[in-house]
Amino acid sequence: MKPRKVMIIGAGNVGTAAAHAFVNQKFVEELILVDLNKERVEGNRKDLADAAAFMPGKMDITVRDASDCADVDIAVITVTAGPLKEGQTRLDELRSTSRIVSSIVPEMMKGGFNGIFLIATNPCDIITYQVWKLSGLPRERVLGTGVWLDTTRLRRLLAEKLDIAAQSIDAFILGEHGDSQFPVWSHSSIYGKPVNEYSVEKLGEALDLKQIGETARDTGFEIYHQKGCTEYGIGGTIVEICRHIFSGSQRALTVSCVLDGEYGESGLAIGVPAVLSQNGVKEIISLKLDEKEKEAFANSVAVIKKSIQSI
């Protein structure tokens, strides 16, 4: 079998957390680290190699330039422009990050990259769309982590309220990985029952679904303000998405996909349920949304498109 190779571009908090999660799960044969800070990335390589030695099996952990990528299966982009400086806005951050991505992706394509791009860099949906445009790859081979972490948080919150396993819950968040995301309660269930029908049966009362959705949305911001970054959750998200791609699981995850008519939209990437295969996005699942959800989706589309137009 061909060795599975993942390249992580950006060895900061998110990239390193993802690398450590890959080491712990060890389903790839080579993990490749890329960073402009050569001393830091070499230190991370050695540290991760030590961690990998405790795990069964063999994994090569190497350092390369981003352009040395012709044999890479999945390239994970986690680069950022760094924290905002005083007086800078989110738009300034977007433009700085966009410039970095604009320099990396063309070099990778010149280097013969023919794999799958997975984008974790924020703002995820905008950068995912930009990478797709820069790469010239088919849209199914460029996706972002999107709202899969937000969806997982939503399920965790429900599981904690109901004292059940999160894996028993089918609940989704769609839209932007940001303020305009929204839960799709019309397609959410627990053991085949609507969420609050199950809650009333078990707890004797309905859950405050609005509050739970807001908490799922805001948790990332809370973590950022409490510790200065988010890393472990998004690191785990990256690894899970890669695992489903390599295994060809055919499982639907809410990742950021480039739309071409789905949900009546095009010209952007946005978080929607997508079936993953070894070629990336096999199918985008178009859910029949209720009127309130349609409005929320349209709002999220408008937010993302406005940001795309600004770069």
UniProtKB/Swiss-Prot annotation:
Pathway(s) it belongs to: Fermentation; pyruvate fermentation to lactate; (S)-lactate from pyruvate: step 1/1
Binding positions (NAD(+)): 14, 35, 40, 103, 120-122, 145
CDD domains membership: HicDH_like
GO cellular component annotations of the record: cytoplasm
GO MF annotations, alphabetized: L-lactate dehydrogenase activity
Binding site for substrate: 90, 122-125, 150-153, 230
Places the protein is found: Cytoplasm
Keywords associated with the record: Cytoplasm, NAD, Oxidoreductase
Keyword ATP-binding annotated: no
Active-site positions on this chain: 177
Any one of the GO BP annotations: lactate metabolic process
Gene3D superfamilies reported for this sequence: Lactate dehydrogenase/glycoside hydrolase, family 4, C-terminal, NAD(P)-binding Rossmann-like Domain
UniProt catalytic activity: (S)-lactate + NAD(+) = pyruvate + NADH + H(+)
Pfam family, one: Ldh_1_N
InterPro entries according to UniProt: L-lactate/malate_DH, L-lactate_DH, L-lactate_DH_AS, Lactate/malate_DH_C, Lactate/malate_DH_N, Lactate_DH/Glyco_Ohase_4_C, NAD(P)-bd_dom_sf
EC numbers: 1.1.1.27
Family affiliation: Belongs to the LDH/MDH superfamily. LDH family.
Described purpose of this protein according to its UniProt entry: Catalyzes the conversion of lactate to pyruvate.
Subunit structure: Homotetramer.
Matches recorded under NCBIfam families: L-LDH-NAD (TIGR01771), PRK00066.1 (NF000824)
Protein name as it appears in the record: L-lactate dehydrogenase 2
Species for this entry: Listeria monocytogenes serotype 4b (strain F2365)
